Amino acid sequence: MANSKQAKKRIIQAERNRQHNVARRSMMRTFLKKTAYAIEKGDVEAAKENFTKVVPILDKYASKGLIHKNKAARHKSRLSAKIKALATAA
């Protein structure tokens, strides 16, 4: 357990930051799921709309260190490829 005032404050800050990050990750995952669901349904317009919303979120969180930059790139690449394939098939 923390003995100094500084250590106690750091524990409080760490917990607050953890909860903030959990909320942000949850929001990001929700957007990814919405995009994946639109692709699965075959709705090109909804998929493109959700994709344009999720890309800046992924970039922002990658730049802030919430997720790794390669993970953001991987999500964007895979979703983009699926949307492109869906658009050409439709």
Curated annotation (Swiss-Prot):
This is Small ribosomal subunit protein bS20. The keyword NAD does not apply. One of its GO terms (cellular component) is small ribosomal subunit. One of its GO terms (molecular function) is structural constituent of ribosome. GO terms for biological process: translation. Belongs to the bacterial ribosomal protein bS20 family. Binds directly to 16S ribosomal RNA. Keywords: Ribonucleoprotein, Ribosomal protein, RNA-binding, rRNA-binding. Transmembrane segments: none annotated. InterPro entries: Ribosomal_bS20, Ribosomal_bS20_sf.
